[in-house]
Amino acid sequence: MAVSFLQSLFSVFRKKSSPQEPATTTAGGPAKRTKLTVGELQEFAPEWIVIGLGNPGAKYADTRHNIGYWPIDRLVERYEAQWLPVEGQKAHAALITVEETPVLLLRSTTYMNNSGEAVGPLASALSLPAERIIVCHDELDIAAGQVRIKDKGGEGGHNGLRSMTAELGTQHYVRVRMGIGRPPKGTSVIDFVLSPFEEADIDAENGWMENTLRDSVDSVTLIVNNGTDIARNDIHTRKH
């Protein structure tokens, strides 16, 4: 079985409870940054916020409910960014530029049910409307291996989305919906979403998660560069 990004990610997350942060010092060099301020985010002037929904901590790292973290972690890796806590906020942030567009990636330091608390205050401070917020999350009503883009709509019982709507005061934010399918007969939804994926699902050669990860990352970059209509036409017509 080939080792995939997902498997590497799992091995890292099982050892720590928060996104990787830089050391405070480097040998023979100046101290590295250990945090960001809201003022620095305002200077960066992001045109988009992208948040992945999940629960913090190694206990939940490889569960279905945390699938929304994976595309933003891949983006951090791709753009050689780093996670830093935001002073006075319930979030870790990473700053990337997609082509020429500044983008703020976020991870909530709260649990899933309070995910919106990471976004609402920052969106307000940055004067970004909800339409410029992309939420990556797990979706029971979409088959495992499929990714769908949605401009707005209800929360479908998803507590993370409920928190987003409550904090933003609107349902008009963009969703990258990552299908995990429905639980098998006899398994409750809670047990299903809080249980880990099977090794076969994340196998680099035969599993479906690599396709899901690629499509969700592409969804984000396509939305940022071209808008939701073009992104949807591309992602929704892909065959795996």
Curated annotation (Swiss-Prot):
Biological-process GO terms, alphabetical: protein quality control for misfolded or incompletely synthesized proteins; rescue of stalled ribosome
Keyword terms, alphabetized: Cytoplasm, Hydrolase, RNA-binding, tRNA-binding
Signal peptide: none
Site for Stabilizes the basic form of H active site to accept a proton, residues: 138
Broad class of the protein's primary localization: cytoplasm
Site (Discriminates between blocked and unblocked aminoacyl-tRNA): 55
Protein localization: Cytoplasm
Gene Ontology terms, MF aspect: peptidyl-tRNA hydrolase activity; tRNA binding
Positions of the catalytic residues: 65 (proton acceptor)
Gene Ontology cellular component list: cytoplasm
Highest taxon above the source species: Bacteria
SUPFAM superfamilies (UniProt xref): Peptidyl-tRNA hydrolase-like (SSF53178)
Keyword field contains tRNA-binding: yes
Primary role: Hydrolyzes ribosome-free peptidyl-tRNAs (with 1 or more amino acids incorporated), which drop off the ribosome during protein synthesis, or as a result of ribosome stalling. Catalyzes the release of premature peptidyl moieties from peptidyl-tRNA molecules trapped in stalled 50S ribosomal subunits, and thus maintains levels of free tRNAs and 50S ribosomes.
HAMAP family in the cross-refs: Pept_tRNA_hydro_bact
Protein name, UniProt field: Peptidyl-tRNA hydrolase 2
Protein source organism: Corynebacterium jeikeium (strain K411)
Name of the gene: pth2
